[in-house]
């Protein structure tokens, strides 16, 4: 997860009339940092994108253009999951529980990956048109209905 500065998680359970259980998890987090890579092996160490072990260089002709690790920052993330359930007793300890779950209730797009490669081997100082574009997002809204047998 690297150096994610802020993370807030709240969970709760409410037992409604009729033994219906309603629970939720709310997660809000600041954006995760990521490394910006040059896209070329600038110092000949076999590791494309780094100028030294702790730096990436955007312009190979300039020492002043090196940037530190975790310079890029993803957008913040927010997610709400809910669950509604009720247990029905069949006999003795045996029962069945009906479940209805919604993940990512508000269908928010939470980006998890970004194109962090700035340039190419031929032109490491010229930004790629895809630099900084998001390449992957967390799962969209999902609904799940289930039955669980307990004994």
Give the ranges of each region predicted by the language model.
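Short, solvent-exposed micro-motifs at the edges of structured domains
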Residues: 1-151
């Amino acid at each position: 997860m690297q150096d994610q500065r802020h993370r807030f998680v709240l969970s709760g359970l409410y037992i409604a009339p009729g033994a219906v259980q309603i629970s939720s998890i709310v997660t809000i987090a600041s954006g995760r940092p990521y490394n910006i890579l040059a896209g070329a092996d600038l110092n000949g160490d076999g590791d494309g994108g780094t100028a030294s072990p702790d730096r990436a260089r955007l312009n190979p002709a300039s020492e002043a253009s090196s940037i530190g690790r975790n310079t890029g920052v993803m957008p913040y993330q927010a997610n709400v999951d809910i669950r509604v359930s009720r247990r029905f007793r069949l006999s003795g300890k045996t029962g069945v529980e009906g479940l209805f779950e919604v993940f990512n209730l508000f269908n928010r797009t939470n980006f998890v990956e970004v194109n962090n490669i700035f340039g190419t081997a031929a032109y490491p100082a010229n930004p790629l048109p895809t630099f900084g574009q998001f390449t992957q997002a967390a799962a969209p809204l999902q609904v799940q209905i289930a039955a669980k047998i307990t004994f």
